[in-house]
Design a protein with these regions (language model features):
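Non-catalytic pre-domain segments flanking phosphatase-related domains
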Residues: 7-190, 394-395, 412
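Long, compositionally biased intrinsically disordered regions
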Residues: 24, 352-413
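Glycine- and small hydrophobic-enriched segments that form the cores of compact globular domains
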Residues: 154-266
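A short acidic (Asp/Glu
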Residues: 199-201, 246-252, 311-318, 339-342
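A short, conserved beta-to-alpha structural element at the edge of catalytic cores
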Residues: 216-228, 324-361
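Short, basic/hydrophobic alpha-helical segments
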Residues: 218-226, 285-299, 318
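A charged nuclease-like catalytic/ligand-binding cleft shared by nucleic-acid processing domains
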Residues: 248-296
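Conserved Lys-Pro-Asp/Glu-containing loop-to-beta segment of HAD-superfamily phosphomonoesterases
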Residues: 297-308
Length: 413
């Protein structure tokens, strides 16, 4: 989406030339003119080719004028918004997220500028783009903003980048209006530690082993039982790992996920206070889930966690409060729950599993994945299992017994 590798069109090439070094007011005016006069195809292409974060930072409003940044943002977020396709709209939002978004309309590019305030022209432009996008295009825009596999996602946008409560309320109201008819699509939500890979309490696998079949399971939950044609990429991780101002935790978590096969996913982090106990962890994750579900009222959700850190409690809370939207809760057992405990949790709608083949069988039983999807998870789990470098023969045999037991639950192919 951002910084396309395709050859630059003449408009993009000229704008890049103008952006080299200091950009004066005449050069800024030429940039605005080039984008304003470009035909629809060229405009969309240019917005996907240019580094818009740099562009928005180069074009300024001045104390005595001209207000070129205001002109540029109004051009893109209002005057020509109807000409823009979803990728170009997402590129604008992304570019604005990567720069300052908390300044007043007095602007901020001259000595003696006012202190940052909420509701500046960048925040208003972001709001304009979302309010000017409807129906399935709005869903596509939100998903495109989420797709960067970095800290600049929808959650960050609405909790950190936009500070004006009035603008935030407008966007949430718009999301609710446009997403009032749920699509039937599911966004899979997952924990990371001892759910995606072994890291804290699970000694059945070597440390930091990605569980066999987990990636295939996420994909099948995303596809759904009808094998929907919409692109994959709805996966979101809800983790207790604490958030902090620098974004380092989120960046490192994204790096770890990419290294282990997750190409695109959003991450919703916890807090230091959320680490006090399992109940606090569950409450913080629930808070993040509720915020996220308001961004995506058109979607349903599934939750995949583990039995070690409050994820089962979170699943119960989700099912109790949002039974129509939470379609399945799957808990990976890493603490050897008793049969009685498993039965009690199942009675509350929480499905406990030992392998991702078992998780897929439970999801298939709930009508969340297809027959062919179930088979794909089984195949992926076997391949993943064979690739693990085990700590001991005993460790491998114990894990193999659980995998074989769950593979026997699958229908013959």
């Amino acid at each position: 989406m951002i910084g396309s590798s395709t050859p630059l069109n003449p408009v993009s090439r000229r704008i890049q030339e103008l952006m080299r070094g200091h950009t004066d007011r005449e050069e800024e005016a030429e940039i605005i003119s080039l984008l304003g006069e470009a035909d629809k195809t060229t405009l969309n292409e240019s917005l996907n080719q240019l580094e818009l974060g740099h562009l928005f930072n180069d074009v300024d409003d001045r104390l005595i004028g001209p207000d070129n940044k205001t002109r540029l943002l109004n051009l893109l977020s209002k005057d020509r918004l109807n000409d823009l396709e979803v990728p170009a709209r997402a590129a604008i939002v992304d570019g604005l997220q990567r720069g300052p978004t908390t300044f007043s309309d007095e602007e901020h590019h001259f000595e003696g500028a006012p202190q940052p305030q909420a509701g500046g022209i960048e925040e208003q432009a972001i709001t304009n783009v979302f309010l000017g996008t409807q129906a399935t295009s709005l869903t596509g825009l939100k998903n495109a903003v989420n797709a960067g596999a970095d800290e600049y996602d929808m959650h960050h946008l609405l909790t950190s980048d936009v500070d004006d409560n009035g603008l935030i309320s407008q966007m949430f109201e718009h999301f609710q209006t446009e997403g009032s008819n749920r699509t039937g699509s599911v966004k899979p939500l997952s924990d990371i530690d001892d759910t995606f890979y072994s890291s804290l309490k699970d000694e059945r696998f070597p440390g930091h082993t990605v569980y066999p079949g987990v990636l295939a399971f996420y994909d099948e939950l995303d596809r759904g039982p009808a094998q929907q044609a919409d692109p994959l990429g709805d996966l979101t991780f809800l983790t207790a790992r604490p958030d902090e101002a620098t974004g380092i935790v989120k960046e490192r978590t994204h790096d770890t996920l990419r290294e282990n096969g997750v190409k695109e996913a959003s991450i919703l982090l916890g807090s230091l206070t959320g680490l006090i106990n399992h109940e606090a962890m569950a409450r913080k994750k629930m808070e993040n889930f509720e915020h996220y579900s308001r961004i995506y009222p058109e979607y349903d959700f599934t939750w995949v966690g583990d039995s070690g850190q409050g994820d089962a409690l979170l699943g119960e809370m989700m099912l109790s409060k949002y039974p129509e939207r939470v379609k399945g809760v799957f808990i990976h057992d890493v603490v050897n729950l008793s049969p009685e405990q498993r039965a009690e949790m199942r009675a509350k709608g929480v499905r406990v599993f030992d392998t991702y083949v078992g998780a897929a069988a439970e999801a298939h039983q709930l009508g969340l994945i297809s027959d062919v999807g179930l088979a794909r998870v089984g195949s992926a789990a076997q391949q993943g299992f064979d690739a693990i470098e085990w700590d001991s023969t005993e460790q491998r045999e114990q894990a193999f017994a659980l995998l074989q037991r769950d593979l026997e639950r699958l229908p013959p192919t």
